[in-house]
Amino acid sequence: MNTSPRLHWSEADTAHDALWRSEAALAPHKRVVLADDRMPADRAYKLACEGTALLWQGDFQNARHMLQALMRRLDRQQPRKGKPGQAPDTPAQAFHQHRQQQGQRAHILGMLLIPFNADHTIPLRRAPDVRQACLEAYGPGTEAYVASLRELLGLIGAHEWRKKGVEVPALKGRIHTHYGVFSPLRGEYIDLVAQAPLPPQAELAFDIGTGSGVLAAVLAQRGVARVIGTDQSDRALACATENLTRLKRIGQVDLQKVDLFPEGRAPLVVCNPPS
């Protein structure tokens, strides 16, 4: 029995459905209407705010313009700083309010949907070639599907970062991150691991939540004989394997799919959890 989530909509009184993809594990939208270049942005914004998703049928570049128009309308709705009665009383309330606003923003922007063919091509005018970006995130396709434009743009950005990589001076090389794996754009924690004194006889170290493998690589480069890097994400482990192989450190690092700590004890444990 196929339990994959499916998106349903109707066109000319005919029911349609397609596989629904969401890396955030969001459920398929219950209300879906077709939209194209003729739909005014105000109308699209109203529908999105009311919980109706827009399955785009027009020009792809105009879909991007529509997403930008939705962003502008959301920005105008943001409460202005300094307005009386709107300031949160505590930092906790401010944090909660910010998270709430960000969640609502993501929900509305995620209402603009794009159709895909089984081979990850987009059947819209002026659509870019996103096959490799989608393949890296979704894997091989088996049937046509629908995903949000916002998610697609994230996939494209991640694909570009994966190709380009991030220069890590401590390694004299680059780290290439996969979609869904934390990218080491900020180097403070890497420099800390690269420069902090190692404990005596540090022959073994644990890198908890190894992600891209950057800290495991730094420890291996510093002379730690064996590093055990753990992660629960298959993507992270595949990413770390590629990076450590490229940096010629894979022989010193044992990557394990483990919930936090591996078996045994180590004199050195490093961890840089995502914020």
Regions found by a protein language model. Name each.
Residues 1-2, 8-12, 262, 269, ...:
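Generic low-polarity alpha-helical segments
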